[in-house]
Each structure stands twice: as C-alpha cells, then as structure tokens.
C-alpha cells in the first residue's frame, strides 16, 4: 500500500483536484518522531494559491479529508499529520513482504540497459585494496539497478595495455626467475615491476628498454605477445579467486587491448568533423566553450610521436558500448579524481554530434587508505585484497568461536562474515567520502558493521527456528506492539529506499537503512518476549519473519551474504 500516493490523492480530492498529483506526492514526508504521525504534509506551498495562511489550509484539509485507512488525521501548525490504522496496515505490509520474493522491487527500468564499467585492475599486478571500491560499488549499483527493473551489463575494463607492459617485459628479461614466477606469478611480477621503477630512477636506459619492448608488443613481436598473454593469464586466474570470494561476476572482460583497432577510426571521425587541431606536433580537440579553463579545455588525442592517449581509448570504448548495447545509461565507477577526464570525454562526444553522451555518468568515489596511507604499486606499498579477505575471515572466525563454539560450517560462515565485513564497510559511507580501513573494527558483531546486520538476521532466524513454525502468516496479524511500530514503519520504507538508492547511485543508502532496521529490531528484541505462547506470539513472529526477509534482501543488494546462523 503506497500511503504517500494515497495521501496525495486524498489531499487533491479535498482541494477539488486543483494540483498536480505528482507534485503533491513529493511533498509528503515521514516525520522522524512517530508521535507526530506516520506521514506529514506541509502546506506552505499551497498558501500562494489559496491566499491563506498555511495553518488555516492545514485545518481545512484535516477537517474535510477522507479518513479511510487512517486512525487519525490532525493539523499541527502548518502540517497535516496522518496516523495509520496499524493492525490493518501491518497485516497488509507483511503479506506483501512474505508472499512475494520481490518485495521492494519495481519495474521502472523495464526494457532499459545499464552498462557499468567497474573494477578494472591492471594485469600482472595483484588486486589490491585500491581496486575494492570500484568493484563493490559497481556490483552494488548493478544489483540496485536490477531491483529497479533494469538489465545491467557489467564490464571489467582490464588494464591490459600500455607502456608499463614494456617495462614489465624488460624487467622479466633482466631479472626474471622462471622457477619463482611459476610458483607465485603475480607477486614475483610485482617485485620485478617495483624493481625496474626504482632502478630506472638512476638508470635511464631501463625506461628506453621498456619503451622498445612495448613497441615490439604493438608490432606483434611473437616473444613480446607470448609474455603479455602469459602475464594476462596468470593475473586473471588470481583475479577470479578474489571475485568469487566477493560474489562478483562480469558480462564482459574486454580490456584496453580490445580497443587497439578501434581508436584510429575515432581519430579519423574527429578529423572528418573538423574537430582536430595540430599543436606542437600533437593532435588536440579544443573545448573552450564546453569546459571551464581549470577543467582541461584542451584534450590531447594523439601525442607528437603518434601515440594515442587514454581519452582516445575511452572514446572508442564509449562509442563501441553505445553501438553494441544501446544503453539507457553508461556508468563509469572510477575514482573522483577522474572527473575532469570524463567531462572531457563527454564534451568531445557532444561536439561530434553524439547527444547520447548525456547518458554517460561518472560514478566517482573517495580514496581508500590503510592506517592513513595511500597505496601505490610503483612504490611497493600495496595491500593485496586477498590478504585483507584472509585476515577478515580469521578475525570473523575468532568472533564466531567465542559466541557460538559449536556452530556447524563455521569456516564457511567465517568466510561470509569476513567478506561481508569488508564489503559493507566500504559501502556504508557516502561513496564520495574517503575511507580508512581498520579490520579489527569492521569485523565486530556490534556497532555500524556488516557483521552486526548479519548477526541480527541470524538472531531473527534463530527465533523462528525455536518457534517451530513454518507458515507463520496463515492467521494474519491481529496485534501490533507499540515498540514494534518503528520496525513496521521502517519495513514499509524499503521500496522507496530502493528507488532513492538508484536515483542517487548511492549504495550507502541501503547500508544505512539496514543498520537502522537492525537497531530497531534489536531494541524491540531487548524489550519484548516474543516466544511466549499467547495470542500475541503469532503476530510478533510474523513481524520477525518480515525483518528476516528484508534484511536478507537488503544485504543481497550490497553483495553481502545473510547467514542463518552465526
């Protein structure tokens, strides 16, 4: 039952249908203090039309409105406050939750495709904590988009091309030990990459050697291509192990190399439209009227040596994806520092006459640090993501052993809790904020953590198991505790929360909702004896089951498991 819509309709009827229904619906609020009503309607915006004080308009609406579905409607100053008939509402809400697997989902995106560029680790380097944010934010946004009816295409735009591969090959040829590399491929390749970067600070010939090997790779030299393919193969194998643990999958793994033969057509297209200008031997696109001066109003398409730039490759990929997928939106889940780059790309596409560039969005996010330090492969201070997941699993196992020493499948649950802690911690803050990682804190079963929400779900499932009942809703809800009403109100907000999370491309909205629902339930559990065999138990168990269902559904939106026992 959509009370926001019902209230807007009833108000419009009272006002003789003189207002736009959608505009009225957007004005309906949910008061933070439930004593002021379950919903409230501010009348300030109606004052100009009726030439009356908002307080008078509120009184008129409260006196004349149809009160069906409401226990009470009253004016408080300029607000009209609505109090729902709680038993009837709760009964209908829980039926919607428990009898439909897709509660909260909608079809607003039916028939539309969303392309999501996410994760994008570099070949021959381990997946580090630096890749976590793009990966889990992209996965969560994909799940949220699907909950809003869209079809998603997740693309892992692998960093599998560039001069760094020339350096990697040069380092391998100089210092590579096949025995060590075969034993631990990516770690050894990283050591070689760090070493050649350090050595090249004093030996400039190493950079020249790297450039020469990359030129061989571009020209299809068999040895260079063989080594490049090997670097890629061992990297993808390690990446997949991490993705499996995070529950992340992709529809395309087309990386930078895929677009090697697609960039020259882009250059020719820009030239044919008179958009290219020569500047000191380089070819540029001038964007003075589309971007402010501090946003790089000149985009270099080709360097003076003929080499293409990242933006050339991104233009090629954007055009290819538009032609291949006919997307409604194309999202790039990339760090906030890349905003100017994507502004440039969109501006060039619009200059070229591609109005669909407006459907491209940069989904930026803040930096991630470990103990206040940024991570860099060149300097060697990287934190492999697999190590973080291993440590999180171990810390979760210790928590589980302490709280539930006899738990079956404890290792499996520890993996779910550890990985869930890492993912939830990343997603619970506004994605534009930077986050610092503290593993000891994020695996705790208390506080604003993923394990706290998971533990709440497990606790609620335990209550249902102890009740010995399966088909709980068969008699309906006949009673609603005063202390339970915040839970009911929170559950009813789930569908709108899913819409808002998609509108803002913001997974933290889901995470914050789940924390609030978990706190509401735990407060209720602390003050209410649920498993008491009386006329109230059935209604209370139905509520518990509703909480279980929504917690599990919400965690799934974030890519976090919901263990039944912890």
From Swiss-Prot:
Catalyzed reaction equations: tRNA(Arg) + L-arginine + ATP = L-arginyl-tRNA(Arg) + AMP + diphosphate
GO CC terms in record: cytoplasm
Residue numbers covered by motif 'HIGH' region: 121-131
CDD domains from the UniProt entry: Anticodon_Ia_Arg, ArgRS_core
InterPro entries assigned to the protein according to its UniProt record, in alphabetical order: Arg-tRNA-ligase (IPR001278), Arg-tRNA-synth_N (IPR005148), Arg-tRNA-synth_N_sf (IPR036695), ArgRS_core (IPR035684), DALR_anticod-bd (IPR008909), Rossmann-like_a/b/a_fold (IPR014729), tRNAsynth_Ia_anticodon-bd (IPR009080)
Main subcellular location of this protein, as a coarse class: cytoplasm
Keyword presence, Nucleotide-binding: yes
Any matching Pfam family: tRNA-synt_1d
Keyword Nucleotide-binding among UniProt keywords: yes
GO biological process per UniProt: arginyl-tRNA aminoacylation
SMART domains: Arg_tRNA_synt_N (SM01016), DALR_1 (SM00836)
Subcellular location as annotated: Cytoplasm
EC number of the protein: 6.1.1.19
MF (Gene Ontology): arginine-tRNA ligase activity; ATP binding
Top-level class of the enzyme under EC nomenclature: ligase
Taxonomy, superkingdom: Bacteria
UniProt keyword annotations, A-Z: Aminoacyl-tRNA synthetase, ATP-binding, Cytoplasm, Ligase, Nucleotide-binding, Protein biosynthesis
Quaternary structure note: Monomer.
Family: Belongs to the class-I aminoacyl-tRNA synthetase family.
Protein name from the UniProt record: Arginine--tRNA ligase
Organism this protein belongs to: Oenococcus oeni (strain ATCC BAA-331 / PSU-1)
